């Protein structure tokens, strides 16, 4: 870089010195700027050289860690291939190298050179996962007997496994809740998860049905892997009849894929410790169509019926859903009496509708008349719909 020549000199010696000093400062600033650019470009060049070096490396094998022998050696398996005792590269973080971890293996030496992220289907990550549900036993009315049985099967093994060891029995691996829709099966499962400080994973059976061969089975496997990672965990499979129906000898391609998914579920349940930190609860309103293999001991070996609530149950449910409502002159016993055949979900809808009637009339309290109109709207509309369906079937078959 050269200093610009100028034909016009400042008048006087002092002015010329000042001019030169200013020019020197400008050039020094330019030098510092160029040096900074040089350092930046050298760093970029170094990064690109490293990137080129990595790109020239031969591809690595992907595998799984079977067992970590010591700080320098581990047993690995290259997917469905033979097992090898291999070296562990010194830069690998030992605390993250655990059985089941996915790793990259050097093509020539089979040494572990990189830890890979866990492989999970996006569908698994899309399941409803609640670290700790907010539902408590006080939020459930009319199911004291069923809650007691569920707590014995799920809560006791997680909180007091030593009791089963002392008695010498194995706790149930899974619990099947069966009964009409809207009777509190999901709420019961969430309440148990809350009281044992467990992660709650809810999946609907139909979400495990996949189009392509093996996808459903892989999804089930990854569901249980996710549960083990977040243990203690309660897996709640709603509408399990979607994958757990009785198997037939003659099946179509789609039915065979559903059967593969069921077989994977059975294998997963057979493969974990009943005294471990993963419990399975399933729900269905069609227990009659379930495959007998699901219900044998060691799988869903505790069956709990969750029926429609009786009068006392309906009264307890109404108390739960109205405890935060501003009631005036409401006799819940009358409402419980006239709602025979209603489910817990129906009773919750009745309480909500009664509140809506009060809001519609610009009131801050709910009356008995609001509840009577709500009963007619919720229960009456269901009966009218059932009558219309029955009439349609009679007329059109």
UniProtKB/Swiss-Prot annotation:
Subcellular location: Cytoplasm
GO cellular component: cytoplasm; proteasome regulatory particle, base subcomplex; proteasome-activating nucleotidase complex
Key word ATP-binding present: yes
Residue span of region Docks into pockets in the proteasome alpha-ring to cause gate opening: 395-397
Biological process according to GO: proteasome-mediated ubiquitin-dependent protein catabolic process; protein unfolding
Binding residues for ATP: 182-187, 321
Pfam families tied to this protein: AAA, AAA_lid_3, Prot_ATP_ID_OB_C
InterPro entries hit by this protein: 26S_Proteasome_ATPase, AAA+_ATPase, AAA_lid_3, ATPase_AAA_core, ATPase_AAA_CS, NA-bd_OB-fold, Nucleotidase_PAN, P-loop_NTPase
SUPFAM superfamilies: P-loop containing nucleoside triphosphate hydrolases
Major subcellular location class: cytoplasm
Coiled coil: 15-58
Keywords: ATP-binding, Chaperone, Coiled coil, Cytoplasm, Nucleotide-binding, Proteasome
GO molecular function, one term: ATP binding
Family: Belongs to the AAA ATPase family.
Subunit annotation: Homohexamer. The hexameric complex has a two-ring architecture resembling a top hat that caps the 20S proteasome core at one or both ends. Upon ATP-binding, the C-terminus of PAN interacts with the alpha-rings of the proteasome core by binding to the intersubunit pockets.
Role according to the record: ATPase which is responsible for recognizing, binding, unfolding and translocation of substrate proteins into the archaeal 20S proteasome core particle. Is essential for opening the gate of the 20S proteasome via an interaction with its C-terminus, thereby allowing substrate entry and access to the site of proteolysis. Thus, the C-termini of the proteasomal ATPase function like a 'key in a lock' to induce gate opening and therefore regulate proteolysis.
Entry comment, domain topic: Consists of three main regions, an N-terminal coiled-coil domain that may assist in substrate recognition, an interdomain involved in PAN hexamerization, and a C-terminal ATPase domain of the AAA type.
Record protein name field: Proteasome-activating nucleotidase
């Amino acid at each position: 870089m050269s200093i610009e020549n100028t034909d016009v000199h400042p008048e006087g010696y002092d002015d010329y010195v000042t001019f030169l000093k200013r020019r020197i400062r400008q050039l020094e600033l330019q030098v510092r700027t160029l040096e900074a650019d040089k350092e930046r470009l050298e760093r970029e060049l170094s990064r690109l050289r490293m990137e080129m070096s990595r790109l020239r490396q031969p591809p690595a094998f992907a595998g799984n860690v079977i067992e970590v022998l010591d700080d320098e050696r581990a047993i690995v398996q290259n997917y469905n291939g033979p097992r090898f005792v291999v070296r562990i590269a010194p830069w690998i973080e030992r605390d993250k190298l655990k059985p089941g971890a996915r790793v990259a293996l050097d093509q020539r030496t089979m040494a572990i050179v990189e830890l890979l992220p866990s492989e999970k289907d996006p569908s698994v990550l899309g399941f409803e996962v609640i670290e700790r549900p907010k539902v408590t036993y006080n939020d459930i009315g009319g199911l004291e007997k069923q809650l007691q049985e569920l707590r014995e099967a799920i809560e006791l093994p997680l909180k007091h496994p030593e009791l089963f060891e002392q008695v010498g029995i194995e706790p149930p691996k899974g619990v099947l809740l069966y009964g009409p829709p809207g009777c509190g099966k999901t709420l019961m499962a969430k309440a148990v998860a809350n009281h044992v400080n467990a992660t709650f994973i809810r999946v609907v059976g139909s979400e495990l049905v996949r189009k392509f061969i093996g996808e459903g089975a892989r999804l089930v496997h990854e569901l249980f892997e996710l549960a083990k990672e977040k243990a203690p965990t309660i897996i709640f499979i709603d509408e399990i009849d979607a994958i757990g129906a009785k198997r037939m000898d003659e099946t179509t391609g789609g039915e065979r894929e559903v059967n593969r998914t069921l077989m994977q579920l059975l294998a997963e349940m057979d493969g974990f410790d009943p005294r471990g930190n993963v419990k399975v609860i399933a729900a269905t309103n069609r227990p009659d169509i379930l495959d007998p293999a699901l219900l044998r001991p060691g799988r869903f070996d505790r069956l709990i019926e969750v029926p429609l609530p009786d009068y006392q149950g309906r009264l307890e449910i109404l108390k739960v859903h109205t405890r935060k409502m501003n009631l005036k002159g409401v006799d819940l016993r009358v409402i419980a009496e006239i709602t025979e055949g209603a489910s817990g979900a129906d009773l919750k809808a009745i309480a909500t509708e009664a509140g809506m009637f009060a809001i519609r009339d610009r009131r801050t309290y709910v009356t008995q008349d609001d509840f009577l109109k709500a009963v007619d709207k919720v229960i009456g509309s269901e009966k009218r719909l059932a009558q219309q369906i029955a009439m349609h079937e009679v007329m059109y078959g």
